[in-house]
């Protein structure tokens, strides 16, 4: 085989590997964020305290459930 064909094959393999790696990394990150949301009830409690509110535990849990529900809906819409 000529040198040009080898170079073309190497370039195509690199491009394919790049796209494959990006796709796999994206799926893993989406899965991780879906399983372990970055916003926790403790973080919500802290944010509400910083805004001058004294929220009840029920209000914190309600807010957390709404955020999780919205993130799952956004993830399902994106698929």
From Swiss-Prot:
Q: Which GO terms describe its cellular component?
A: plasma membrane
On whether Membrane is a keyword of this UniProt record, the answer is yes
Q: Does the keyword Transmembrane helix apply?
A: yes
Q: How is the protein disposed in the membrane?
A: Single-pass membrane protein
Q: Which residues cross the membrane?
A: 4-24
Residues of the signal peptide: none
In Pfam terms, one family for this protein is: UPF0154
The record's InterPro entries line, in alphabetical order, gives: UPF0154
Keyword terms: Cell membrane, Membrane, Transmembrane, Transmembrane helix
- UniProt subcellular location: Cell membrane
> What family does the database annotate?
Belongs to the UPF0154 family.
What HAMAP family does the record tag this protein with? UPF0154
What protein name does the entry list?
Answer: UPF0154 protein SUB0399
Source organism per entry reads Streptococcus uberis (strain ATCC BAA-854 / 0140J)
